[in-house]
């Protein structure tokens, strides 16, 4: 028996991969064991587990395989990315189960917004988030964890496996320490400009190389119908040995193991780390400085207006000079506004532009240098749009968000 999976097609035409029954069994079992571990709060109590799968369903690998894997935890309902349907399922099933909510990171945010609009009291429920498909800022995680007990991300690709690596309590704390201590970020990732997602992986299943700052993965499990040998999905990142990460932290007086234990009361996995900045080409460049979606997401997620903001996308736009001709380009952040009355709010646009600019000045040496050489580099533009309008047309049917337009 075999299964045909499609990639999302986010970079062009979807590609079809063949997976055999034994291969799928190994993937699903590993995912289920890890998920069970991550939702174990150490209390020793046993409650039924219900997984609500908000990933896109169909021929794509993630949605169908999450359903197949997490059936091993208990009941699964595959709603797809439909917040209303998911809330209806929660109302029907009540507050006794532990809910595992799976989906892309923006969907979990949308679920909270829908609950607020419907006055649906999520505080009565115990929920864990399992996300993947794209990066997640710590600002978004912090926001989600006001409601969720914990939110963990997984790294993978339809072209490889959907569970190549996963966040653990330890990897999350390492990432947070790197965000708070630039010297640690430099020691681990070589830069403070772009905070990567940080995962741990099993080297007995995946041999990961770094070539030209991109991850190259070989799946080493023997039960493969479609071999993946030195496969490059063009994700920028690298790998780190467990001992090297702990040593780098302790050299700065930091103890990620203690912090991880406070988050999840179990001994950390002594597995190597894998860090991912995102797709290698996911950036816009302006006056020699790269502007990354991760920095913009962090800035918008931390700002006071985050409740009314939806998706965003980066672009370079032409601006008119005094004679009506285009005489320059500027970086522009297109932002969805969930409140239609705020779309024309000039004060909101200016405030958001300042938030993004301040984040870049504080986090990007390239951007600071560009501004020091020419103040025009600090001229960040913001364009506000109705939900689903402008560059966000089609977002409702797109599997993954598009961050560069």
Question: Residue ranges of each PLM-predicted region?
Answer:
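Generic short alpha-helical segment signal, independent of protein family or function
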Residues: 8-12, 36-40, 56
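Short helix-loop-beta connector
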Residues: 40, 44-48
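Residue-level marker for well-ordered alpha-helical positions
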Residues: 2, 63-64, 138, 294
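AMP-binding/adenylate-forming
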Residues: 20-37, 50-110
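Short, charged amphipathic recognition helices of the HTH superfamily
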Residues: 2-3, 154
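Conserved adenylation A10 loop of the ANL superfamily
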Residues: 3-19
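Active-site glycine/GP-rich loop and adjacent strand/helix microenvironment
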Residues: 75, 79-405
């Amino acid at each position: 028996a075999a299964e045909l999976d499609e990639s999302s097609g986010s970079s062009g035409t979807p590609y079809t991969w063949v997976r055999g029954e034994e291969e799928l069994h190994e993937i699903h079992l590993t995912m289920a064991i890890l998920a069970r571990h991550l939702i174990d709060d150490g209390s020793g109590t046993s409650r039924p587990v219900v997984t609500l799968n908000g990933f896109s369903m169909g021929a794509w690998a993630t949605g169908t395989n999450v359903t197949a894997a997490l059936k091993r935890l208990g009941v699964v309902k595959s709603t797809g990315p439909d917040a209303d349907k998911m809330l209806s399922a929660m109302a029907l099933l009540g507050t006794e189960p532990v809910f595992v909510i799976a989906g892309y990171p923006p969907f979990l945010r949308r679920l909270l917004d829908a609950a607020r609009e419907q006055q649906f009291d999520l505080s009565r429920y115990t929920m864990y988030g399992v996300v993947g498909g794209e990066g997640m800022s710590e600002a978004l995680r912090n926001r989600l964890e006001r409601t969720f007990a914990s939110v963990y991300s997984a790294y993978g690709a339809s072209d490889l496996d959907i569970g190549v690596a996963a966040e653990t309590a330890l990897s999350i704390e390492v990432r947070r320490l790197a965000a708070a201590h630039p010297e640690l970020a430099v020691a681990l990732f070589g830069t403070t400009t772009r905070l990567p997602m940080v995962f741990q992986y099993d080297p007995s299943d995946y041999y990961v190389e770094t070539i030209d700052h991109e991850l190259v993965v070989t799946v080493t499990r023997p039960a493969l119908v479609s071999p993946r040998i030195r496969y490059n999905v063009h994700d920028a990142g690298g790998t780190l040995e467990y001992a090297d990460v702990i040593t780098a932290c302790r050299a700065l007086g930091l103890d990620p193991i203690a912090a991880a234990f406070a988050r999840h009361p179990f001994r950390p996995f002594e597995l190597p780390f894998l860090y991912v900045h995102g797709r290698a080409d996911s950036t816009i460049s302006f006056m020699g400085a790269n502007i990354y979606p991760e920095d913009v997401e962090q800035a918008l997620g931390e700002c006071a207006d985050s409740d009314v903001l939806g998706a965003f996308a980066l672009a370079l736009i032409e601006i008119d000079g005094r004679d009506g001709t285009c005489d320059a380009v500027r970086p522009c952040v297109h932002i969805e506004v969930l409140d239609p009355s705020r779309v024309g709010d000039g004060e909101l646009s200016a405030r958001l532009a300042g938030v993004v600019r301040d984040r870049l000045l504080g986090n990007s040496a390239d951007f600071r240098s560009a501004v020091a050489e020419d103040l025009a580099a600090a001229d960040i533009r913001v364009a506000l749009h109705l939900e689903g309008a402008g560059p966000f047309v089609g977002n409702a049917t797109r599997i993954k968000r598009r961050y560069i337009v």
